[in-house]
Amino acid sequence: SGDYRLEADRSCSAFEPLRCDVFVTESTFALPIYGWQPQREVIDEMLRWWTENADASRASVLFCYALGKAQRILAGFADAAGASLPGAIVCHGAVESMNHAYRASGVALPDTFAVGDVERAALRRALVLAPPSAARSPWLRRFGTASDAFASGWMQVRGTRRRRAIDR
């Protein structure tokens, strides 16, 4: 194992220890230098960031891993804001294919859209979920001036934040 979900949400159960003879793990983020806010506080902070950007007609580009992290964020927004989100949620194709798999397995996620399905003016209020590999790609240019963030435990590391040159 490698990832330990400390809090359950609609996208995934929390880690459950099981009795076994041998357990092999890699757990970088278990080191004492990492401290984690409760999931709801992180989602509320993301929602405030998105709302501030939407109010300024600026897209919010949130880089996150296409499998797992993106769906955790979507589930968190649905639970925190329900139907009162500040704009459309636009997903990169890599994220959207994973959303389809989650929905097919019965996980309820908020509505998400391909970039071509959202009016150009509405893109300035959108939350854009994209994998880190999409950074500085032609795909992102269509959102114009945007605020960007990266949802990853690696952002707890000061050097990573500096190297990525991301707003948050």
Where are these regions (language model features)?
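Active-site metal-binding loops of divalent metal-dependent hydrolases
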Residues: 2-4, 27-29, 67, 94-95, ...
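Short, solvent-exposed amphipathic alpha-helical segments in soluble enzyme
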Residues: 16-18, 76-84, 106-107, 143-146, ...
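Short, charged, surface-exposed secondary-structure boundary motifs
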Residues: 9-11, 33-35, 97-106, 121, ...
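Structural beta-strand/beta-sheet cores of well-ordered domains, especially the beta-sheet scaffolds
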Residues: 2, 87, 145-147
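Short, well-ordered alpha-helical microsegments
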Residues: 8-9, 70-74, 136-138
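His/Asp/Glu-rich metal-coordinating catalytic cores
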Residues: 1-68, 79-82
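Hard-cation-handling environments
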Residues: 43-60, 64-124, 129
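C-terminal regulatory/interaction regions
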Residues: 82, 114-168
